Amino acid sequence: MGEPYEAVRVNPSDPEYQKLNPAGQVPALDTGDGAPLTQCSAILGYLAHTHPDAGLAGDETPLGQAYLGRWSAFFTGDVHPAFFPVFMPQRYTTADDEASLAKVREAGTALVRKRLDLLQAHLDGRTHIVGDTRTYVDAYSVPMIRWASSILPGGLADWPAVKSHHERMLADPGVERAMRDEGLIES
């Protein structure tokens, strides 16, 4: 967005943080008006609309905004949760043996693949997820596609349009800065 910001690492169970976000989840944005904003989709939409010069809000028509909402919801409600069984298999079984946990991870990996299949079909022949310009949804996809690339044998080889999109986003200066701020890449 080109605006200064401060990224702060928090412990979601910290009582001080829970005053900001009682759900104890990240992210949260202090908008400066006394009402913190939570949920990634809401925060990204807010930032895109309050910083229009960044050009991340996409087509401002009702249908254009509906498409942004649809794809943002896809990542929030379909893609992100598909990783839960992979990263936290103990949440999905009462068994604690490695064989049972491996089966849960395998089921999660299958869900991730299905989500990538849907995204691949959508991105085939496109440069961006929504419309003809980069939007906040493109940036929002980066962490989840990065996870997929790291957990799947062969990375993103089976999803060439997803891989191309992800590589373009990794080269984006704003994405690069955010990843550097998160300690995911070196300065």
What spans do the regions from the language model cover?
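Positions that flank functional sites
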Residues: 13, 134, 184
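Active-site-flanking alpha-helical
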Residues: 48, 144-145, 179
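Residue-level signal for nonpolar/aromatic packing positions in well-ordered secondary structure
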Residues: 29, 43, 68, 119, ...
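Phosphate-coordinating loops and pocket residues in cytosolic domains that bind phosphorylated ligands
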Residues: 19, 171, 180-181
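Terminal-tail/helix-coil boundary detector
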Residues: 178-187
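GST-like fold's C-terminal all-alpha helical module
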Residues: 75-171
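GST-like domain detector, emphasizing the conserved glutathione-binding G-site
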Residues: 1-106, 110
